[in-house]
Amino acid sequence: MIPGMRATPTESFSFVYSCDLQTNVQVKVAEFEGIFRDVLNPVRRLNQLFAEITVYCNNQQIGYPVCTSFHTPPDSSQLARQKLIQKWNEWLTLPIRYSDLSRDAFLHITIWEHEDDEIVNNSTFSRRLVAQSKLSMFSKRGILKSGVIDVQMNVSTTPDPFVKQPETWKYSDAWGDEIDLLFKQVTRQSRGLVEDVPWLDPFASRRIEMIRAKYKYSSPDRHVFLVLEMAAIRLGPTFYKVVYYEDETKNMRVSTSVNGGVGIVSACTRYCVADPELLLESLAEVKHSAMTRRIRDVEDERHRQVKPNKQAKDRLETIVNLPSSQVLTREQRDLVWKFRHYLRQFPKALNKYLRSVNWVHPQEVKTALALMNDWELIEAEDALELLSSAFTHPAVRAYSVSRLLEAASPEQVLLYLPQLVQALKYEQGQQLPEEGNPVPVVSEEEGKIPSVATTPTEELEGRDMTVVTKKEARKAASGDLATFLIDYALASPKVSNYLYWHLKTEIESTKESKEEHSKMYQNIQDRLMEALVKRPDTRAQVDSLHQQQIFVEDLIILMNEAKARGGRLNESKSAEFRTMLSRAKHMLDLKGVHLPLDPSFRLSSVIPDTASFFKSEMMPAKISFKVLQPNGKADRNIPEEYTVIFKTGDDLRQDQLIQQMVRLIDIILKKGQLDLKLTPYLVLSTGVGQGFVQCIKSKPLRAIQEQYKAHKMDCIREAMKELRPGDGPFGIEPNVIDNYVRSLAGYSVIMYILGLGDRHLDNLLLCENGKLFHVDFGFILGRDPKPMPPPMKLTSEMVQVMGGVKSKQFLEFVQHVDSAYRILRRHSNVLLNLFSLMLDAGIPDIAAEPDKAIFKIEQRLRLDLSDEAATKHIFTQIESSLNAKMAMISDIIHAYKQNLM
């Protein structure tokens, strides 16, 4: 035994569970030592090094990497004598708590070198990887590693968190029992199991380090090591090991051996007793509620005349005004039930009443359905809530469909169509009709309802847009939502066109995840086609849909072949695509196929010279088509050309949803007498990973900034002045400036409420008339690939167009933002209802956290605030956006990346 190293009388194993430690993981980066030799450049010397540590749990990166600060390198004498390359002695706090670590958690450790000779945009320093390694945080027995650890580093050029790591340096059994005992005693001393000898410990430590270095560098391979110190858990004189354990209990468990030990108090052990009734409903409250409601089931005149006092009225008003996404408490449900007859006169209270019904109680259900039919009629936007997954009773869903039929305009049905298609998932018993039972179709001789604009085609032009009388339509619609949609499709070629493509997309997207939904959508699509075939005036629509399908498939084939043949450069691929289009006879004569994106237009032929690929990973194509003019004569209302962007490999359903919200917000604001000059362009997903986007004539702000960079901050304003000079503010036409101010305000509010991410100057477009709009919505609901994104995209150049923050135009901008925010808060339910129906649609940013999607929108609307407080809140967001420095840095980095492409 080494002199002076005496064990304590008892060696109990004291530990805590990892789930009980609510503090962040800490690691001390001490030294980088060894003999470094670059094979490619033997004379290379390291300079300006820093270490970086990234945490991985379940093979996923957790948070951002944490790096050391700058330290001057050691002098040459230390480097030669002690093999010291860099010294930090710095504690790093990692962005994860011990309680959140997974069993397979590990650290990816990298050593980087600054390169002084390359500076990117004066903001980003280039760096070169020197070495890397990974360190498992738990041992094979599930004990968190602690104390000083020599991590062997691999000299590398490319960072790889899953790099194959050699075993951490250890002593060898071949060195003898004494060396083995030495290092075991060192470990015991770090755990406090060896008594300290003050006069001897310094000498022993230096000698141990010399022995360690001798054996560590004895290998012929030139190794480099990073010395780390993992934080230890200590309470008084006792050190505790951290044992991995999954438990949600917050009380820390301290365990000792049976025999106890010096400094260990067995009485400190605490245990948490499980409560099997935790989070369950109180049986007393359940019984009280059942008895109360059972008494009131006897509907007599006395109960019908029950009216709330002032205090109860205030509470009821608060409940009725709650957002549709908020769950009612038991007390709130009982209060609504108690005064249900009083609330019957308020249409918006119906949904809250139906949420208060106990649907497993037959008598209560019977009473609720009878009262529902006597309630004041609700609006179409409130009927959408009754089609969500929260309402499964067929009678309630049938009532919702009947209200859509009576209260919703054809334009509203067309607007809500994606959500209505999603709501089919919650319908019961959607199946093909049995043989002998024909599909219900609309009558050709009964009364009419307003129809959506017809498609200008010889086969469909002038078609009688008829459905059954409202009485018979309600009877047909009372069965299921699918019948309602098919009936509407028969009345409108536009609805049937979009319904067909929405169903096709859902058939493909649910085929792997939920086959029963895919079959259900396939059945409904078959019903739609069968119903169209049966009516003479709708048969042409079936042929039109088949032609569109062939047109889309041909377009995909040509695009894929052009990408494969065109070489590596984007320009060569675009040239190949133009050549292939010019040789494709079927594309030069499209025979008047209806454009799936907008079936109001029929296409005559493609214009090959206009085709090109965008510089992006998926390389979408921009294509222009000649529009077929009716009777061969030019029509002022029909453009000669129609330009689209066709994408493959991108899921357009998220962009489609955002544009639907923009269109809805535009309608809501205009009803509130506020026109913010929004530009809701068309987006249609024609399948999984494919679809059309309407191309609006405009220019990205990035291109404007580059073209007019000589004007610096005034670049956008100078571009507008050159294109539309006038006698208005800043020498620009007055309506152009007004369009810019209003559209900027509108999209700023939309960006904030919907949490649009990845906003840069390439996806902000400006039209010649001054209207600004956003494109490409790959990140929504607060998700953003850039750190610290601003609530609104307001760059200095964009504000300078209005004359700065002290100008009259900027004041108008702020007022428009405030007015729009107030109006949208008053119509929050329709936004929340539409998003709630999309929770199971598989849209990427909603599917990531479906339980939080609605809450994120509700949180940004701040429905808990008064109008005055909401005004202060939105003003704060504007101020925060104006002062966002990180957004400016992100724009610089994005521009640099685009220039490299």
Curated annotation (Swiss-Prot):
<dbReference type="GO" id="GO:0034271">
    <property type="term" value="C:phosphatidylinositol 3-kinase complex, class III, type I"/>
</dbReference>
<dbReference type="InterPro" id="IPR016024">
    <property type="entry name" value="ARM-type_fold"/>
</dbReference>
<keyword id="KW-0067">ATP-binding</keyword>
<dbReference type="GO" id="GO:1901076">
    <property type="term" value="P:positive regulation of engulfment of apoptotic cell"/>
</dbReference>
<dbReference type="GO" id="GO:0005640">
    <property type="term" value="C:nuclear outer membrane"/>
</dbReference>
<dbReference type="GO" id="GO:0022414">
    <property type="term" value="P:reproductive process"/>
</dbReference>
<dbReference type="InterPro" id="IPR000403">
    <property type="entry name" value="PI3/4_kinase_cat_dom"/>
</dbReference>
<feature type="domain" description="C2 PI3K-type">
    <location>
        <begin position="21"/>
        <end position="189"/>
    </location>
</feature>
<dbReference type="InterPro" id="IPR002420">
    <property type="entry name" value="PI3K-type_C2_dom"/>
</dbReference>
<dbReference type="GO" id="GO:0005730">
    <property type="term" value="C:nucleolus"/>
</dbReference>
<dbReference type="GO" id="GO:0042995">
    <property type="term" value="C:cell projection"/>
</dbReference>
<dbReference type="GO" id="GO:0005768">
    <property type="term" value="C:endosome"/>
</dbReference>
<dbReference type="InterPro" id="IPR035892">
    <property type="entry name" value="C2_domain_sf"/>
</dbReference>
<keyword id="KW-0254">Endocytosis</keyword>
<keyword id="KW-0418">Kinase</keyword>
<dbReference type="InterPro" id="IPR018936">
    <property type="entry name" value="PI3/4_kinase_CS"/>
</dbReference>
<keyword id="KW-0444">Lipid biosynthesis</keyword>
<dbReference type="InterPro" id="IPR001263">
    <property type="entry name" value="PI3K_accessory_dom"/>
</dbReference>
<dbReference type="GO" id="GO:0000425">
    <property type="term" value="P:pexophagy"/>
</dbReference>
<dbReference type="GO" id="GO:0050708">
    <property type="term" value="P:regulation of protein secretion"/>
</dbReference>
<keyword id="KW-0581">Phagocytosis</keyword>
<keyword id="KW-0443">Lipid metabolism</keyword>
<dbReference type="InterPro" id="IPR015433">
    <property type="entry name" value="PI_Kinase"/>
</dbReference>
<dbReference type="Pfam" id="PF00792">
    <property type="entry name" value="PI3K_C2"/>
</dbReference>
<dbReference type="GO" id="GO:0051036">
    <property type="term" value="P:regulation of endosome size"/>
</dbReference>
<dbReference type="GO" id="GO:0000407">
    <property type="term" value="C:phagophore assembly site"/>
</dbReference>
<dbReference type="InterPro" id="IPR036940">
    <property type="entry name" value="PI3/4_kinase_cat_sf"/>
</dbReference>
<comment type="similarity">
    <text>Belongs to the PI3/PI4-kinase family.</text>
</comment>
<dbReference type="GO" id="GO:0048015">
    <property type="term" value="P:phosphatidylinositol-mediated signaling"/>
</dbReference>
<dbReference type="GO" id="GO:0005777">
    <property type="term" value="C:peroxisome"/>
</dbReference>
<dbReference type="GO" id="GO:0008340">
    <property type="term" value="P:determination of adult lifespan"/>
</dbReference>
<comment type="subunit">
    <text>Interacts with bec-1. May interact with dyn-1.</text>
</comment>
<feature type="domain" description="PI3K/PI4K catalytic">
    <location>
        <begin position="607"/>
        <end position="886"/>
    </location>
</feature>
<feature type="region of interest" description="Activation loop">
    <location>
        <begin position="774"/>
        <end position="795"/>
    </location>
</feature>
<feature type="region of interest" description="G-loop">
    <location>
        <begin position="613"/>
        <end position="619"/>
    </location>
</feature>
<dbReference type="GO" id="GO:0001891">
    <property type="term" value="C:phagocytic cup"/>
</dbReference>
<dbReference type="Pfam" id="PF00613">
    <property type="entry name" value="PI3Ka"/>
</dbReference>
<keyword id="KW-0547">Nucleotide-binding</keyword>
<dbReference type="InterPro" id="IPR008290">
    <property type="entry name" value="PI3K_Vps34"/>
</dbReference>
<protein>
    <recommendedName>
        <fullName>Phosphatidylinositol 3-kinase catalytic subunit type 3</fullName>
        <ecNumber>2.7.1.137</ecNumber>
    </recommendedName>
</protein>
<feature type="domain" description="PIK helical">
    <location>
        <begin position="302"/>
        <end position="527"/>
    </location>
</feature>
<dbReference type="GO" id="GO:0006897">
    <property type="term" value="P:endocytosis"/>
</dbReference>
